[in-house]
């Protein structure tokens, strides 16, 4: 069975005063999107896990433990972890934790929680974009 991990920031830890976030965004809207993501992954027949983390070292530890527990085919990183400019360093920690903990998994990015399954589908099965390595060029 296809295994997908959706990693994002815990909705209750988001700084909604950050002007780089969409206006009107709140924890309830994010959670509703996460719930849709979980349902959509299940509807596609995937075994989808959700890992919402705090933007600190404890979050990285939780992510590392999750990655160590299962072999994932794809890990989708949510926009809340990568879009706010002030979160760049933490986003780099997330990417490196995924690279170390799931080196064979594809990494995908959603634009909002609701399109998490679409992001993963770009890299799973027949929907996978081909990647040319330098040895194939």
Model-flagged regions — what are they?
Residues 57-64, 117-118:
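Structural motif
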Residues 37-57:
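Active-site rim loops that border cofactor/substrate pockets in soluble metabolic enzymes
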Residues 61-99:
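Mid-chain, well-packed structural core segment of small domains
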Residues 22-25, 48-50, 110-137:
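Short, glycine-/small-residue-rich phosphate/pyrophosphate-handling segment
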Residues 33, 90-127:
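Ser/Thr/Gly-rich flexible loops in soluble cytosolic domains mediating phosphotransfer, phosphorylation
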Residues 1-21:
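N-terminal, charge-rich interaction modules
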């Amino acid at each position: 069975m296809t295994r997908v991990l959706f990693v994002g920031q815990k909705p209750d830890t988001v700084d909604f005063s950050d002007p780089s976030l969409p206006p009107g965004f709140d924890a309830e809207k994010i959670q509703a999107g996460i719930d849709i993501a979980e349902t959509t992954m299940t509807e596609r027949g995937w075994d989808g896990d959700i890992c919402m983390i705090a933007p600190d070292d404890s979050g990285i530890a939780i992510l590392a433990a999750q990655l160590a527990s299962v072999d994932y085919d794809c890990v989708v990183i949510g926009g809340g972890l990568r879009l706010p400019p002030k979160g760049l360093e933490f986003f780099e920690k997330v990417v490196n934790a995924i690279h170390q903990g799931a080196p064979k998994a594809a990494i995908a990015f959603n634009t909002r929680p609701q399109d998490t399954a679409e992001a993963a589908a770009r890299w799973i099965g027949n929907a996978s974009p081909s990647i040319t390595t330098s040895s194939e060029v």
